[in-house]
Amino acid sequence: MEGRLFLIGVTMGLYTWKSRSLKKNGGLDSPLRRGLWHGLFCSLAASAAALVLSVSMEKHTRFVFVGPNAFAASEFYPSIIAAIVGFVYGFFRGRAEPENKRGYFLLEDSEWAETVFSAVLLAATIMYFIVQAFKIPSGSMENTLLIGDHLFVNKFIYGLRIPFTGKRVFNFRGVKRGDIMVFSFPDQDPRDVHCGSVQYHRDFIKRVIGLPGDKIEVRAGQLYINDVPIKNEPYAHFSDGELRQPESVRAFDLSPKKYQELWQNHELDGILQDVQRDFFGPVVVPPNSYFMMGDNRDRSCDSRYWGPVPLKDVRGKAWFIYWPPARMGTVH
């Protein structure tokens, strides 16, 4: 969301700058030019509103549009339609402006664009660098986080992200085992299906189980870290009473090297399906990456299925539940 807000803010800023230049040079004196420029503003405003609304109301199923860096179709098409409608409306409204109100629409447009530029850039900066609100959409973190919980995520604790680089500066502390983190789904191919649907570009929230270099394995539902069984995890929740798959079909005769390779390349669940929920690994967490699991171990689509999470994809650390009031408090 913050990336979209930043784009909207920059666009409105450019519109404000160009409007001042055109008015100063008399470039908007004719009715036709005023209509075109007012149409452009209405087009930008309508497409921005449609984009924000579509992202806010986006459902779990996403329809991917063209390439891996493109907008989802659920965001792209409403924005295009809104832009066209906004331009047509603005063009005829601006062109029909009476002589006694010449420039009224353009002045109003510039003021609105400047306001949006300032407000949106401020909001995008806060969301990108400092804190952002999220809503829990599934039960994968029960009973720590419940469906419908609203929480703030600390975006700077692991360092301030440098836009478009994947790098961080001013690291306040490193990632620790047990941290609950929000991250972007690590597989960068928008066509890949994981856990039954396309997960590309979605935000996930899970708990850090494995740090770089850790050996992770699950045997009959029991988690092992560096060959040590992890007992009495206070946050782990198991909702099924039986193992989903027998160990005899666990690895489909995959060599340890091939198993690790498939896991790191986010391809393991395409071969093993649901086997790895109760029988997984062993794998070694690669450098600058983390092994993530949901607290609801039997109902979580996590690193057992789609691989490690690189630090560059980490959005921040879950910090504080602010809604509903009965569950208000810090996240552990």
Where are these regions (language model features)?
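Aromatic-capped interface at the extracytoplasmic side
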Residues: 127-139
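N-terminal Sec-pathway targeting helices
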Residues: 108-116
